[in-house]
């Protein structure tokens, strides 16, 4: 087997995010949630859940400002109605983010006509024709664009989508891949007394993200500097945890199962996996300059930080995105990377590699399985 380094690398050329127009501070969300929750659920419980969520604001397509929007007290929409909401909102979110990502990629000479492959991802809805067909029409992409949809993989789907994009450009250096994600979690607000569903109601929000991945040759440097180089992705499936987190399609929307032991399992299990994965790139935990930890909730961030012995500064970006946007499922990790790219110095570890070496970033996200996905990048220096 050849050990020669590849002549090209997968460059993250641009990244953009989007959210619905309706911003909901915690107090407003709590007022609406109280009217949509069965009366036997104590308002004090909802208040505690909201306060412990770490979320101060969120954007939700299902709610009009100051109104219930899609929902009505004592009326529970069926899955078909929720999918109609998802389709409208997901199209808008993905198109908004994709247009911004393409505009940014223009500095590298990339236009809509340059896109050869389109990877879409969402776990909050389905439609056919889907987001991919809509984006081809809306953005003016070639009708011969190769399409791939990463469906129903949960909060780590951004990593899976980027893994597909990376594999594509390494196999075909002429490829230019648009990755578009949209999550409309507010389409699955539940009128319920189940604690895990109440927690899900409290945590999740909506958003969109788009990224462009292209090959970059170290010899020619034909493109302008990328935001980062995607070095690799890594996966794990934690044994005997399939009942701890699940995402099912029900008659009244998608239903989340969240086990209370998830943070403890992650704290116990992930360090060995992370260390093994980083070691394949000659890295240790202390070499990582920037961390993007999917904020499944404050306890998940706490668990990962404890397992990896990360200082508060290393998870500040993850907490900030949770605070300002909520858990947007697969879209959340790109939001965190965007924050790191905009102000990397604020989140860098002081004991990370020297200025002469690469600037490693790591993204971690978790989903039903329990499954973990990791992306390792070398960030561009600013």
Give the role of each language-model region.
Residues 127-133, 179-199, 232-250, 297-306, ...:
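Active-site-adjacent elements of ketosynthase-type condensing enzymes
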Residues 85, 96, 101, 246-322:
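A contiguous, well-structured pocket-lining segment that forms one wall/lid of small-molecule binding clefts
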Residues 6, 123-125, 130, 142-144, ...:
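Claisen-condensing/thiolase-fold acyl-transfer catalytic domains that form or cleave C-C bonds
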Residues 97-115, 220-222, 272-289, 340-353:
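Phosphate/pyrophosphate-binding loops at sites that engage ATP/ADP/AMP, CoA/4′-phosphopantetheine
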Residues 53-141, 152, 285-301:
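Conserved beta-ketoacyl condensing-enzyme motif
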Residues 2-87, 176, 191-268, 272-276, ...:
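Condensing-enzyme catalytic core mediating Claisen C-C bond formation in acyl metabolism
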């Amino acid at each position: 087997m050849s050990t020669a380094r590849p002549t090209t690398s997968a460059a993250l050329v641009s990244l953009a995010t989007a959210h619905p127009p309706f911003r909901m501070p915690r107090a407003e969300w709590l007022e609406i949630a109280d009217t949509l929750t069965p009366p036997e659920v104590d308002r004090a419980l909802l208040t505690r859940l909201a306060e412990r969520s770490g979320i101060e604001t969120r954007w939700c397509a299902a709610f009009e400002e100051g109104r219930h929007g899609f929902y009505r007290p004592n009326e529970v929409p069926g899955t078909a109605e929720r999918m109609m909401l998802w389709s409208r909102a997901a199209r808008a979110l993905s198109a908004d983010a994709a247009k911004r990502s393409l505009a940014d990629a223009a500095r590298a000479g990339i236009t809509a006509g340059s896109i050869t492959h389109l990877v879409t991802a969402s776990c909050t809805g389905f439609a056919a024709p889907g987001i991919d067909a809509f984006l081809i029409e809306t953005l003016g992409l070639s009708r011969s664009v190769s399409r791939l949809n990463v469906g129903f993989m949960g909060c780590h789907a951004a990593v899976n989508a980027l893994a597909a994009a990376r594999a594509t450009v390494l196999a075909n250096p002429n490829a230019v891949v648009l990755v578009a994600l949209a999550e409309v979690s507010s389409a699955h607000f539940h009128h319920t007394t189940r604690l895990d569903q109440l927690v899900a109601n409290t945590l999740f929000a909506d958003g969109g993200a788009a990224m462009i991945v292209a090959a970059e040759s170290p010899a020619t440097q034909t493109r302008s500097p990328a935001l980062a180089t995607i070095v690799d992705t890594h996966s794990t499936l934690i044994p005997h945890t399939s009942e701890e987190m699940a995402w099912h399609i029900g008659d009244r929307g998608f239903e989340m199962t969240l086990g209370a032991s998830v943070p403890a399992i992650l704290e116990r299990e992930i360090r060995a996996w992370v260390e093994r994965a980083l070691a394949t790139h000659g890295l240790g935990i202390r070499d990582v300059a920037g961390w993007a930890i999917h904020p499944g909730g404050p306890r998940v961030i706490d668990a990962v930080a404890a397992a990896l012995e990360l200082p508060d500064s290393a998870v500040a970006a993850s907490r900030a995105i949770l605070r300002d946007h909520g858990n947007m499922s697969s879209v959340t990790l790109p939001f965190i990377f965007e924050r790191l790219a905009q102000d990397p110095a604020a989140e860098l570890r002081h004991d990370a590699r020297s200025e002469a070496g690469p600037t490693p970033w790591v993204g971690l996200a978790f989903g039903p399985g329990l499954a973990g996905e990791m992306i390792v990048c070398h960030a561009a220096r600013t």
